[in-house]
């Protein structure tokens, strides 16, 4: 049964004034507001599922992807426990199979990636398991983007560089493509050897932050490295018993991306070295319900 009844007119995205992922209250859809209300539900399971969906939408927001209104309508059934994630997966796939007969617009392609990848991210987050290996990291990328990017799960084969707002248009120094496999194997080997039971709560967050940042810094794939690192990181921490306490990722995903970049960046001429302090503040809010003030402008490095 197809639960998407009609394809609603999708609201035009406005140009954000503060940064690409800021959304004003007046621009937020009524449907999204309803999803947010579930995150404050007294029903524990509803709240957990809603926070997972909001985290998923936060992850997608780093590339300005927003779910369609029809998709937001259908996931309410999952949040309320009336169907499982596999049913959402099937309905979404069938929905886009049907609407492709009527439209091939760029807006449709935008929402198709937003909706399909969101379902796949949710599938991964619900597993609450995460194999620490380069192979499983590649599988995460493949699961998220198969049928969307032709080289999903395939390691990068060319140089990588990207101007970053938080670095005043400088780039993190990414490893050459021929070293990616070795870097991943070494990183996972080191992480598997860490005995987290011997660390304090604060030191655990610092250790997780260091691992996540280094994973991001390898820039393993041709596309979607940020989203893949985000999803894998959340899979990993959920598998270790952490739980989302709030919608920090939904509201502050861009902050976390900037924090990862700062944890990877070195400029000895300016006296700038990698720091995980911003990542730890974010994770403290997300998993420990702390109240750290997350300000993007505090991370900005002035150009030379």
Label each region the model flagged:
Residues 2-304:
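FIC/Doc superfamily catalytic core
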């Amino acid at each position: 049964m197809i639960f998407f009844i009609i394809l609603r007119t999708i609201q035009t995205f406005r140009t954000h004034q503060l940064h690409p992922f800021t959304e004003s209250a007046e621009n937020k859809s009524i449907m999204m507001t309803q999803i947010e209300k579930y995150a404050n539900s007294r029903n524990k399971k509803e709240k957990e599922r809603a926070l997972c969906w909001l985290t998923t939408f936060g992850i997608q927001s780093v590339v300005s992807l927003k779910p369609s209104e029809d998709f937001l309508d259908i996931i309410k059934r999952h949040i309320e426990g009336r169907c499982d994630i596999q049913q959402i997966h099937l309905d979404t796939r069938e929905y886009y199979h049907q609407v492709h007969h009527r439209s091939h617009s760029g807006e449709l392609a935008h929402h198709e990636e937003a909706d399909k990848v969101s379902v796949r991210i949710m599938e991964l987050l619900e597993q609450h398991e995460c194999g620490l290996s380069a192979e499983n990291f590649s599988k995460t990328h493949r699961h998220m983007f198969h049928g969307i990017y032709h080289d999903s799960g395939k390691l990068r084969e060319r140089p990588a560089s990207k101007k970053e707002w938080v670095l005043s248009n400088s780039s993190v120094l990414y490893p050459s493509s021929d070293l990616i496999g070795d870097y991943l194997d070494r990183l996972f080997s080191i992480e598997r050897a860490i005995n987290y039971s011997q660390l304090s709560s604060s030191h655990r967050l610092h250790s997780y932050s260091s691992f996540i940042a280094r994973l991001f810094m390898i820039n393993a794939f041709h596309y979607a490295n940020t989203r893949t690192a985000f999803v894998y990181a959340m899979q990993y921490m959920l598998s270790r018993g952490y739980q989302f306490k709030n919608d920090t990722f939904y509201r502050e995903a861009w902050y976390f991306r900037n924090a990862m970049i700062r944890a990877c960046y070195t400029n000895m001429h300016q006296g700038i070295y990698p720091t995980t302090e911003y990542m730890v503040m974010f994770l403290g809010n997300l998993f420990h319900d702390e109240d750290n003030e997350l300000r993007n402008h505090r991370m900005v490095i002035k150009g030379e």
